[in-house]
């Protein structure tokens, strides 16, 4: 079976998409190539790194990346995680499916907000995996 590719996109590739990439690699495993990117790059938020560390997922080596058209066009599924990314997502080829999974932006908020959003993203990716079986 060929590996499928999922591409998580948010506005700055700083918090939500970084956590989604970490969860995606953990939950979807070897069957999927998992990437994340942003409409802009804001650097990986240290609180996102810390939040994922709490659930034993290391995203400290992640980089904040702009959308890569090659990855985008080869993706099986593009998932936008905020309305800005959903509204500004580049036009996709017909073979690429797009879904919007909206999550609150924890940036600039208190620590419990990072934990809540982290857990919501993990739960949504787990639910997605269960639909694949």
UniProtKB/Swiss-Prot annotation:
UniProt keyword annotation of Disulfide bond present: yes
InterPro entries per UniProt: Arsenate_reductase_ArsC, Ptyr_pPase, Ptyr_pPase_sf
The protein's role, per its UniProt record: Catalyzes the reduction of arsenate [As(V)] to arsenite [As(III)].
Keywords: Arsenical resistance, Cytoplasm, Disulfide bond, Oxidoreductase, Redox-active center
Taxonomic superkingdom: Bacteria
GO molecular function, one term: protein tyrosine phosphatase activity
Family that this chain belongs to: Belongs to the low molecular weight phosphotyrosine protein phosphatase family. Thioredoxin-coupled ArsC subfamily.
Residues at the catalytic site: 10, 82, 89
GO BP term, pick one: response to arsenic-containing substance
One Pfam family from the record: LMWPc
PANTHER family for this protein: ARSENATE REDUCTASE (PTHR43428:SF1)
Compartment(s): Cytoplasm
Enzyme Commission number: 1.20.4.4
Disulphide bridges, residue numbers: 10-82, 82-89
Top-level enzyme category: oxidoreductase
Keyword Phosphoprotein in record: no
Reactions listed under catalytic activity: arsenate + [thioredoxin]-dithiol + H(+) = arsenite + [thioredoxin]-disulfide + H2O
Signal peptide (from-to): none
Protein name: Arsenate reductase 1
Gene Ontology cellular-component terms listed: cytoplasm
